[in-house]
C-alpha cells in the first residue's frame, strides 16, 4: 500500500530506532555520531522510504530538495547488504550501485555513505567520477576491490565496460538519484547500459525532485511494481505542482537598472556578511570575473568569496566546495553546476544575479536554502525589461514578493573600473564575462519574455564596470543600443593596460611583438606584390603608348631611356671606384652579372 503524503514538518516523531524492519545498532550509533541531534529522528521521506526498501520493495520517490533523500537510500543499502546471503562479499563482487548526475553530488553521496558502509566489515565502496585518470580508478579497484559503486553515469559505464573482473550476479540494490536530471543531462544511454549489466532480481530506488515523462518511462523500465512515495513540502510563498520547494522559504525579486545591479549585489552581501550565501550567475566567465572583482572591493574584504563552475578542474571544484561546506559564513559564486543535489548545510540566502536559462532550474537553485524545515531566503535580480518574468513564474505556481532597491547602496562602478585600469586580468575577464552573458541571454528558454533585443547594452556594460563596450556583431549591426554608457575620462590606451602578474605581462609583450612582426611581414609582402603589379601595369601602359606613337617618337623615347640608363650606370661606377659598393653589388645593379 502506498504511504500517504507526509506533513510539512521537517522531522517526524519517528525515531530511526523505531523503524520496522529495525535498523542495526551499528547504523543507529553511526547516525548519532555523524549528525546533529536531529539525526535521532527521521524526515518524512526517510520515514516513508527506508522501511519499504528494507522490505525488498522497489520505490519511486518524489520528494522536495533538501528533504534528506540521501540517507533515505544509503541506510537501506547498508542494511540490505548486511542481510544478504552473499555477505560478506568477495573483493570484486558488486552488491550495490548508486548513480547520480554530477561529480559533486556523487562525491557528497560517497562522503555521506562512508560512515555507514564502514560498519560492514570487508565491504569497500569506491567513488567513480570523471575529471581524473580512469586507469587510476581501475588500479584501485583491482588492488583494493569494490562492493559498492558510487558515481556518475559516464565513468560508471566506462569502468563496467573495461573491467571484466567485476561480478554483478549477486547485486542487491540499484539507486538512481536525481533521475530527472540524469535524463536532462543526456545520460539515458549510459544509464540503460548500466542497467543492462545488472540482474533483474534486485531492489531499485528512483529518486527525483520532478516527475517528467522521461522519469516515468525510466521507472517502468527499471523498477518492478514500485511503491510511489510522495512527500510534499508546501512553501509559505510558493506552491508547485511539478517541483517541490522547501517549506520556510521566503522568495523575493528585485528590479533595478543594469548599471545598478552590481552595486545592489555588493550592498546585499555586506548586509549579510555573517551569513552563508550562494550567488548564481549565468555563465562560467561571469563567475570568473565577479569572483575576481568582488574579492577586491574594500567593503567585501572580510567576506570569504569562493567561485565554482563547470570549467574548473575537478580538484579545484572539490577544494572549493569542501572549504565552503565547512565555513560558517561566506559566499559561493557559481553557475548551475551546483544547483542540483548538493547538500551544503546552513545556507541562509540564495541570490540569483541572473535568471536561469532553464526556468526549471529556478526551483533547484532556491532549494539550496530552507532545508530540513529551516527558514531561508531567496532573491532574483531582474532588469526593468525582465519584470514579466515575475508573472511567468507566478503562472508556474511560484509567488515572489517585491523587494525595493537599497537607497544606501554605494556605487561600486568607479572601483571596478579603477581595478580594470590597473590590471589587465580584470579588464579582459570583464569583457569576456559581458560577451558570454549576452550570448547566453540569447539562448534563454524564456526568450519571448527575456528578449535579448531589449537589453540596454550600454547600461549593462556600465554594470560590469567595463572601460568600453566590447566589439560585438549585435552592437555593430545596431541591433543593440550602446546608449547609457559613460566613457572613462582620461583613460590610457587600452592596449597599454598591463597585467599585474609579471609572468602574464611578459607573455603578453612577447605575443604583441610576435603579432607586430607578423603584421610587418604581411605588409612587406603585400607592398611587394602591389609594387610588382604597379610595375607590370606601368610597363603594359608604356608599351601600349609606344605602339600608338610614330617611329620617330618611339626612337626619341628610347634614346632618352638609354641615356638615363647610362647615367645611372655611370653613378654606380663612381661609387664602385670610391669603395661605396662592392663589385658584386655593382654587377647585380647594372646587370653585368647576366653576361
Task: List each model region and its residues.
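Conserved AAA+ ATPase "SRH/arginine-finger" region at the nucleotide-binding site
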Residues: 228-238, 254-259, 353-356, 379-384, ...
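Conserved helicase ATPase core of P-loop NTP-dependent helicases/translocases
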Residues: 135-140, 288-295, 301-339
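SF2 DExD/H RNA helicase N-terminal ATP-binding lobe
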Residues: 2-275, 282-285, 292-303
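Intrinsically disordered, low-complexity, charged terminal tails and linkers of eukaryotic nucleolar
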Residues: 1-20, 25-26, 32-35, 84-93, ...
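Conserved segment of the helicase C-terminal RecA-like domain
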Residues: 366-410
Amino acid at each position: 500500500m502506498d504511504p500517504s503524503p507526509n506533513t510539512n514538518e521537517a522531522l517526524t516523531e519517528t525515531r530511526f530506532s523505531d523503524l520496522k524492519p529495525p535498523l542495526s545498532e551499528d547504523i543507529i550509533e553511526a547516525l548519532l555520531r555523524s549528525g546533529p541531534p536531529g539525526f535521532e529522528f527521521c524526515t518524512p521521506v526517510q520515514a516513508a522510504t527506508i522501511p519499504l526498501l528494507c522490505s525488498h520493495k522497489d520505490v519511486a520517490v518524489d520528494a522536495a530538495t533538501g528533504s534528506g533523500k540521501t540517507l533515505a537510500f544509503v541506510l537501506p543499502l547498508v542494511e540490505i547488504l548486511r542481510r544478504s546471503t552473499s555477505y560478506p562479499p568477495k573483493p570484486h563482487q558488486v552488491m550495490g550501485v548508486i548513480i547520480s548526475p554530477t561529480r559533486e553530488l556523487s562525491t557528497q553521496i560517497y562522503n555521506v555513505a562512508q560512515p555507514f558502509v564502514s560498519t560492514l566489515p570487508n565491504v569497500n565502496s569506491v567513488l567513480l567520477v570523471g575529471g581524473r585518470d580512469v586507469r587510476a580508478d581501475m588500479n584501485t579497484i583491482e588492488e583494493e576491490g569494490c562492493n559498492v559503486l558510487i558515481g556518475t553515469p559516464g565513468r560508471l559505464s566506462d569502468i563496467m565496460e573495461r573491467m571484466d573482473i567485476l561480478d554483478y550476479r549477486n547485486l542487491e540494490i540499484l539507486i538512481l538519484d536525481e533521475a530527472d536530471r540524469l535524463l536532462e543531462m543526456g545520460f539515458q544511454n549510459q544509464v540503460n547500459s548500466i542497467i543492462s549489466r545488472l540482474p533483474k532480481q534486485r531492489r531499485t530506488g528512483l529518486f527525483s525532485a520532478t516527475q517528467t515523462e522521461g522519469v516515468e518511462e525510466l521507472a517502468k523500465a527499471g523498477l518492478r511494481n514500485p511503491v510511489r512515495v510522495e512527500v510534499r513540502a508546501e512553501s509559505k510563498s510558493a506552491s508547485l505542482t511539478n517541483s517541490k520547494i522547501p517549506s520556510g522559504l521566503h522568495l523575493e525579486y528585485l528590479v533595478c537598472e543594469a548599471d545598478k545591479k552590481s552595486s545592489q549585489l555588493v550592498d546585499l552581501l555586506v548586509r549579510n556578511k555573517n551569513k552563508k550565501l550562494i550567488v548564481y550567475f549565468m555563465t562560467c566567465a561571469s563567475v570568473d570575473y565577479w569572483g575576481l572583482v568582488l574579492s577586491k572591493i574594500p567593503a567585501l574584504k572580510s567576506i570569504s568569496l569562493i567561485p565554482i563552475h563547470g570549467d574548473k578542474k575537478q580538484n579545484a571544484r572539490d577544494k572549493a566546495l569542501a572549504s565552503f561546506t565547512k565555513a560558517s559564513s561566506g559566499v559561493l559564486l557559481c553557475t548551475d553546476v551546483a544547483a542540483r543535489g548538493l547538500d551544503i548545510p546552513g545556507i541562509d540566502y540564495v541570490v540569483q544575479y541572473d535568471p536561469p536559462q532553464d526556468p526549471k532550474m529556478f526551483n533547484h537553485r532556491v532549494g539550496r536554502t530552507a532545508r530540513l524545515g529551516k527558514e531561508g531566503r531567496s532573491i532574483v535580480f531582474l532588469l526593468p525589461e525582465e519584470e514579466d518574468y515575475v508573472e511567468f513564474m507566478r503562472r508556474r505556481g511560484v509567488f515572489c514578493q517585491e523587494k525595493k532597491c537599497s537607497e544606501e547602496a554605494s556605487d561600486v562602478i568607479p572601483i571596478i573600473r579603477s581595478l580594470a585600469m590597473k590590471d589587465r586580468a580584470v579588464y579582459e575577464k570583464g569583457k569576456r564575462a559581458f560577451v558570454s552573458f549576452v550570448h547566453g541571454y540569447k539562448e534563454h528558454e524564456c526568450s519571448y519574455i527575456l528578449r535579448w533585443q531589449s537589453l540596454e547594452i550600454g547600461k549593462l556594460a556600465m554594470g560590469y564596470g567595463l572601460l568600453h563596450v566590447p566589439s560585438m556583431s549585435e552592437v555593430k549591426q545596431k541591433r543593440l543600443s550602446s546608449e547609457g554608457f559613460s566613457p572613462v575620462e582620461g583613460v590610457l590606451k587600452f592596449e597599454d593596460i598591463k597585467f599585474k602578474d609579471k609572468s602574464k605581462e611578459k607573455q603578453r609583450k612577447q605575443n604583441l611583438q610576435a603579432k607586430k612582426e607578423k603584421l610587418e611581414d604581411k605588409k612587406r609582402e603585400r607592398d611587394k606584390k602591389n609594387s610588382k603589379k604597379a610595375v607590370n601595369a606601368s610597363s603594359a601602359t608604356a608599351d601600349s603608348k609606344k605602339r600608338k606613337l610614330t617611329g620617330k617618337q618611339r626612337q626619341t623615347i628610347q634614346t632618352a631611356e638609354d641615356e638615363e640608363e647610362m647615367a645611372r650606370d655611370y653613378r654606380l661606377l663612381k661609387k664602385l671606384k670610391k669603395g661605396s659598393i662592392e663589385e658584386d653589388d655593382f654587377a647585380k645593379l647594372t646587370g653585368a652579372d647576366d653576361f
